[in-house]
A protein has these predicted regions:
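Short, structured coil segments at secondary-structure junctions
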Residues: 124-125
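Conserved beta-loop-alpha segment that forms the PLP phosphate-binding cup at the N-terminus of a helix
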Residues: 82-107, 116-121
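N-terminal "arm"/small-domain region of PLP-dependent enzymes with the aminotransferase-like
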Residues: 1-65
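Flexible phosphate/Mg2+-sensing switch loops adjacent to catalytic phosphate-binding sites
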Residues: 110-111
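Conserved N-terminal alpha-helix of the aminotransferase class I/II PLP-enzyme fold
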Residues: 44-92
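Alpha-helical scaffold segments in soluble metabolic enzymes
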Residues: 11, 72-73, 96
């Protein structure tokens, strides 16, 4: 696979360059609701690229376009069969991993210094 291909970035830039009206989350509305100091520090484009899912950008929960292509590229780069992008940082991934890895009644060894999201992954399913 061509690791120089950037399907998700290209889709985001196509959306941003189309001069969209920001009526969705996040609430900063593409930088209009951001303190100017942040815009000056991060650059004017970064907040415009902070988008939720729209039909033009694909659907994270059922990717068929740019997100799917980007996940396939990531899997290829990592040498994995599959790769899934997630929200909420590693917390969501850790919780999902623990929930998926252990069946009911199974024991899991967790180090004391494990991130609290690992413990939440044990608590959530009961």
């Amino acid at each position: 696979m061509n690791q120089d291909h950037t399907p998700l970035f290209d889709a985001i830039m196509g959306y941003v360059n189309g001069n969209p009206a920001y009526f969705r989350i996040p609430g900063h509305r593409g930088e209009n609701g951001v303190n100017r100091k942040w815009v000056e520090y991060a650059g004017p484009g970064i907040f415009r690229m902070d988008l939720t899912e729209t039909p033009l950008l694909d659907d994270l929960h059922n990717p068929e376009g740019a997100i799917r292509e980007a996940q396939e590229l990531a899997a290829d780069l990592f040498g994995a069969d599959h790769s899934w992008f997630l929200v909420n940082g590693t917390t969501c991934g850790n919780e999902a991993m623990v929930i998926a890895a252990a069946g009911e009644g199974e024991r899991i060894i967790v180090p004391r210094n494990a991130h609290k999201s690992v413990l939440m992954g044990l608590i959530i399913p009961g």
